[in-house]
Amino acid sequence: MRPEGVETRTGTSGFTAAPLPLAQEEQARADMYGLVARLLLAPPDDALMADLASLGGAGAGDNTLRSAAADQPLERAWLALSLAARQIDGAAARDEFAELFVSTSIPTINPYGSLYLAGFLHEKPLAALRTDLAGLGLARRSGVLETEDHLGALCETMRRMILGGDGASRQPLARQQAFFEVHIATWSGACLDHLRQADGARFYASVADFIAAYFEIERAAFDVASDFAFD
């Protein structure tokens, strides 16, 4: 997923300034949201599985997991995801994705905010989300089947809010926080619990743990930023 800059106009001369460089930690956040979106929106291809398997380090295994510090849940979840990717081949991971997320009737996992918040698909939470997306200059691309309240699509939106690009501006941290708290934090925990506990979830149980750990880091970071924000 290629990060894209945004251009801003300053003054009255029509001068177009290059965007300020993105801080390393912000690029890392965008990359994490991009990974979550990729894992939830489409079955993992062999290249993605190989990348995940390599991130734990050569020969990493249970000893590595046990040695991870108890106060670093994201690190433990990351290592566990890498280990899970080494323990399953790409075809089996794709079969698992299909078993969990794809069905001719009702899939095992329906990661849509409207369903969790209102009990049905295409309800008021989706309408409210679309209003907020319009305010950000974002909209679902034509031909995309998933609605905007799919958890993967919401993570892609967070990535775009951090990076900007394609006509959308980078958003300040306070606006990112508001979007996260309203459209993701309110229901993603229950959804990830369902994914973790679903029959047939092996690799994707580790995916759920990883996403939950990352969201908790985001929530804590937003809280700290709010504490230091100026009125």
Task: Give the positions of each predicted feature.
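Surface/interface-facing alpha-helical segments and adjacent flexible terminal/loop regions used
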Residues: 1-231
